[in-house]
């Protein structure tokens, strides 16, 4: 066997249907598009969300709220993820160095999820009550 002699197994490949190539093909004349109308023409399609002229659902529903820009620079870190940080001090830069958070994050809150086994010192990060209890139970401490 050589690379230049390889070919797919017999019957595993189907030739694409050639549209508009005679009556005998089964897809001649109109080519499966029916007769007349917008969708029979080339480039004839309606934009997504168009409902034939009636007021679209997107416009019938009221506007609601907004997307907070603060969410783009804020993150929650689980207690279990603190184990990924090398060293005993956990702060914004050490979390970024350990790839726990992305580089554009400015505000971090540590939440209770999972377990922590090593004693760490948390500096300059917000911490929930449950996470604070878990960190202190493991021998760590929280510094502002």
UniProtKB/Swiss-Prot annotation:
Q: Where is the composition biased (Gly residues)?
A: 21-31
Q: Where is the composition biased (Basic residues)?
A: 32-44
* Gene Ontology biological-process annotations: translation
What keywords does the record list, in alphabetical order?
Ribonucleoprotein, Ribosomal protein, RNA-binding, rRNA-binding
Q: Name one GO cellular component term.
A: cytosolic large ribosomal subunit
Extract the ranges annotated as region (Disordered): 1-57
Ribosomal protein as UniProt keyword: yes
Q: Which GO terms describe its molecular function?
A: rRNA binding; structural constituent of ribosome
Pfam families listed in its UniProt record? Ribosomal_L27A
The cysteines covalently paired via disulfide bonds are: none
* Function, as annotated: Binds to the 23S rRNA.
Q: Which family does it belong to?
A: Belongs to the universal ribosomal protein uL15 family.
Could you describe the subunit structure of this protein?
Answer: Part of the 50S ribosomal subunit.
User: Which PANTHER family does the UniProt entry name for this protein?
Assistant: 50S RIBOSOMAL PROTEIN L15, LARGE RIBOSOMAL SUBUNIT PROTEIN UL15M
* Database matches in NCBIfam families: rplO_bact (TIGR01071)
The name this protein goes by in its record:
Large ribosomal subunit protein uL15
Annotated organism of origin: Vibrio vulnificus (strain YJ016)
The gene designation is: rplO
